[in-house]
């Protein structure tokens, strides 16, 4: 269903399967002279050694969409999507939107984004700054130039603050600074006016003596944390 002229990487403006636009003109050797290109090496989009015009290709289909997720900061987020095709190969490309899905950019493999070109995207050490960002996958068939790229539904990441980095988000953590004193006891005021709320502050009154000790608990290594 995809004409050779297109699979070769050439131009067929009127989509009649002939090089260039009709009517076609040729020289004495039968070479088309009315086209703007042609007669160069045909393309091999998937680099498998078979020219695309000799290789059966097919449209890709979306099988599954990624799922939105909520995690604590500095943890790993996973997004999974998949596609299928009856012939040829598929190429995956994950994209990110920082503006609610209005614009999208291709992700590049890095220490933060792993697996940008396969069915599973990992976001390593997720930071608060990416909360509400959206992610989607684009699936295409490199050996089938007539295919239409398939886009998954977007999935959103929500990253929750975790003051003590114990992998329990503050919204769920009963002790946000791990000093052994419940947040309900310490509350969210700022007794010493240092800009750190009491439930995050290891020395809430600013007297130089950590809360864990003033509460009568044990702090063997004097780091302000219980134990």
What are the residue ranges of the model-derived segments?
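Extracellular calcium-associated, cysteine-rich motifs in secreted modular proteins
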Residues: 1-60, 146, 157-227
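Surface-exposed, proline-enriched loop/turn segments that connect beta strands in immunoglobulin-like
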Residues: 63-68
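A short beta-strand segment in extracellular, disulfide-stabilized domains
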Residues: 75-83
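Core motif of extracellular immunoglobulin-like domains
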Residues: 81, 94-95, 135-137
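Solvent-exposed loop segments of extracellular immunoglobulin-like
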Residues: 85-93
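Surface-exposed, flexible coil segments in extracellular/virion-facing regions
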Residues: 98-125
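Solvent-exposed loop/turn motifs of extracellular immunoglobulin-like beta-sandwich domains
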Residues: 127-134
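Short, solvent-exposed loop/turn segments at the edges of extracellular beta-sandwich modules
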Residues: 140-148
């Amino acid at each position: 269903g995809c004409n050779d002229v297109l699979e070769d990487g050439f131009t067929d403006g009127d989509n009649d399967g002939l090089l260039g636009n009709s009517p076609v003109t040729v020289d004495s050797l039968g070479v088309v002279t009315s086209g703007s290109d042609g007669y160069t090496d045909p393309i091999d989009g998937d680099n498998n050694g078979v020219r695309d015009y000799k290789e059966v290709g097919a449209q890709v289909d979306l099988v599954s969409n990624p799922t939105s997720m909520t995690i604590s900061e500095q943890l790993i987020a996973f997004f999974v999507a998949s596609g299928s095709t009856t012939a040829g190969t598929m190429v995956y490309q994950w994209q990110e939107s920082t503006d609610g899905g209005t614009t999208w950019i291709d992700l590049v493999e890095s220490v933060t984004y792993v697996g940008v070109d396969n069915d599973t995207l990992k976001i390593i050490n997720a930071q608060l700054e990416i909360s509400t960002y959206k992610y989607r996958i684009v699936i295409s068939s490199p050996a089938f130039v007539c295919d239409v790229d398939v886009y998954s539904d977007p999935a959103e990441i929500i990253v929750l603050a975790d003051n003590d980095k114990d992998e329990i988000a503050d919204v769920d953590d009963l002790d946000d600074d791990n000093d052994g004193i419940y947040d309900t006891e310490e509350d969210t005021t700022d007794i010493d006016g240092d800009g750190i709320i009491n439930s995050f502050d290891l020395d809430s009154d600013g007297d130089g003596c950590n809360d864990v000790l003033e509460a009568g608990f044990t702090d063997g290594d004097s780091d302000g944390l219980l134990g």
